[in-house]
Every structure is written in C-alpha cells, then in structure tokens.
Swiss-Prot record:
InterPro entries: Calcineurin-like_PHP_lpxH, Metallo-depent_PP-like, MPP_YfcE, PdiEstase_YfcE_CS, Phosphodiesterase_MJ0936/Vps29. Mn(2+) 1 binds at residues 8, 10, 35, 109. This is Probable metallophosphoesterase YsnB. Belongs to the metallophosphoesterase superfamily. YfcE family. Pfam families: Metallophos_2 (PF12850). PANTHER family: VACUOLAR SORTING PROTEIN VPS29. Mn(2+) 2 binds at residues 35, 54, 78, 107. GO terms for molecular function: hydrolase activity; metal ion binding. Its EC number is 3.1.4.-. Binds 2 manganese ions per subunit. Its cofactor is Mn(2+). Keywords: Hydrolase, Manganese, Metal-binding. The keyword Membrane does not apply. The gene is ysnB.
Amino acid sequence: MNVLIISDSHGLEEELQTIAKRHEAEVDLMIHCGDSELETRHPALEPYAVVKGNCDFAGDFKDELLLTAGSRKILVTHGHLHGIKQTLLNVYYRAEELGADVICFGHSHIAGSEVLRGKLMINPGSIRLPRVRRTESYAILTLENDAATVRFYDQAGNEIEDLQNRVTL
C-alpha cells in the first residue's frame, strides 16, 4: 500500500493538483497534513484527506484524522496542537491512545522520518516554504507487511535519496 503525504502548501493550488496527478496511479491514499490555506471543498484538495493547520482559517477541517492503510492505522495531524517543534512525545502519546502505527504531521516544514518507540513518524516537509533543507518536499510511504519505506520527492517529482528511510514496524 502506498500513501502520498504532503503538508504546508500555504495557498499553492496547481502544485497540489500536479503532484496528485503525477502519483494517482501508484498511491492508494493521499494525505495533506494541514496549512493548505484553502477552502475545505477547494478542487486542489479533492484527492486528499486533509487536517486543519494553524494557518487554516477557512473551512471546517478536523484537527486530526485516524486513517487505515492496509493493516496499519495512521494518525494525521498538523502538529501545532501537540507542540511538535519542542517534542514528538505529545503526538506519540496521542497515537498510543488511538492505536496508530504511523504518525503524519507537518508544521515545522522540516522533512524527515524516524521510528519512536515503535511508531513511524513522518513529516513530509513543505512544498512551499521548506526549512533546514532548501528543497520543497513531499513523501510517499510504502507499507509492506512489517516493513515501511518512506521516500521523499522534490516538487518536480525527483527523489531526494538521502532522506529515504526503510524501517520495520
């Protein structure tokens, strides 16, 4: 199962549509981790399961979603309500409460993935305003049995190889 994860697009429309179209045949689920700054029913968000970010004032997005991808549960949140810029433990504990195996979040605009106490944490970065790295990014998570692979891509669809992460869940 493949899951496209994007976040912090901050008003971009065409780019969201281009990325969705590029990967629509290869992914089973598309997630937007907030700060789209678009209306809830905006056409650019149509293929995505979207949560509310701290810059999403229009629309009625939920603060979090619990999605199923194969046998795995994915917690989707923006991260600002969990203080992810200070610690990942708060969002980890929320995932524990919900029984989630994977946590997708944004807010910091810093692309990366890691396993914390058995839970895969993924921040796809930002396709508008990346931090730390200068490359706009999004991610694709591949789930296979007990293995997960996270690949990151720039806005043009080129893989950012040094961010790839393969883990056991």
